Amino acid sequence: MKLSDFDFDLPSELIAQYPSRERDNSDLLIAVTPPIKTKFYNIIDYLKEGDLLVFNNSKVIKAKLNLGENITINLNQKLSDDSWSAFAKPARKLHVNDEFYFDNHKVIITEKLAMGEIKVKFELNDISVFEFLNKYGEMPLPVYIRRSHSLCHPVATTTGSKTYLNNDWIPWSNHGMTNTQNDNDRYQTVYSQIEGSVAAPTAGLHFTKDILDKLKAEGIQATFLTLHVGAGTFLPVKTENIHEHKMHTEYCSITPDTAKIINKAKQEGKRIIAVGTTTLRTLESSCNNGIVKAGSFKTDIFITPGFKFQTADMLLTNFHFPKSTLFMLICAFAGFKEMHELYKYAIKEAMRFFSYGDATLLCRK
């Protein structure tokens, strides 16, 4: 298939610049015929006793560092205890062996690669890299969140001949809060545990502890795996032949207990619901002859139409970029034609896209 097959027109005003007022107050689109638009807090109405939700419990680290002189780096992947790959902006201002000081701690540029990628080493005094980042770093919000732009403060969205009031989301300043304070909270799932992601597994951002408690009370199970989301998740596909695209690699882990829970549910005919594309990619990467294997590994799995799924029956996910690997994934999961039609409906209904946007619940075709 061609890259252009996965294109669609997305009005820029539908790119969410802020999350909804409350986590579970975002919209949820149920992919049935015709589609059902509801609120996320109603998700329990579309699940049933015995269902198994599989979550990604990776925790977003404060991976963005300001080096001064308008230079920033965004960490990408851990290479060793003190070394990381990163993306620099602008990379041309950096040189190998450049040193940057944060009080009595030091960050050293050790290698320059292509496309703005670099390698850095941390020389720290009595603290870990994660402790250093918690003190000096910032949440690595995606580049399409541009709050200095006029899009930051909309009171309504116009799509075609229709205008929709955005009463459920407003800038942080209207709450008497700062961007930093609230992104630290809202760009993180309530169940995150294991530090390592440099972008949020966004499908999980809608869940509250109250919803998780209600799901448990209804006999809906939950289990957790880990995929540390890398910055490569935002890299565009540049080849018209999609199969020439080289996927980024990401670290994954599935515990023996989690694998046992998933395999037992499958054997009993229970529905497996992957919360997010990161969860689905981890499950499919670990699966052999229908059995999910425990272990820690790296994956560069690239899921496109024609892929034979072995694990999840349903997928909860946000709305994705045109021509992105994630839109290709959902077309593979729920149908190429069906997803194009669903996205047309979502755009007509002025649903919000990307990390801080709305969610959709898909059934495997």
Curated annotation (Swiss-Prot):
InterPro entries: QueA, QueA_dom1, QueA_dom2, QueA_sf. Pathway: tRNA modification; tRNA-queuosine biosynthesis. It holds the Pfam family Queuosine_synth. Disulfide bonds: none annotated. Its EC number is 2.4.99.17. Keywords: Cytoplasm, Queuosine biosynthesis, S-adenosyl-L-methionine, Transferase. The keyword Signal does not apply. GO terms for molecular function: S-adenosylmethionine:tRNA ribosyltransferase-isomerase activity. It is found in: Cytoplasm. GO terms for cellular component: cytoplasm. Its main location: cytoplasm. GO terms for biological process: queuosine biosynthetic process; tRNA wobble guanine modification. It comes from the Bacteria. Belongs to the QueA family. Monomer. Transfers and isomerizes the ribose moiety from AdoMet to the 7-aminomethyl group of 7-deazaguanine (preQ1-tRNA) to give epoxyqueuosine (oQ-tRNA). HAMAP family: QueA (MF_00113). PANTHER family: S-ADENOSYLMETHIONINE:TRNA RIBOSYLTRANSFERASE-ISOMERASE. This is S-adenosylmethionine:tRNA ribosyltransferase-isomerase.
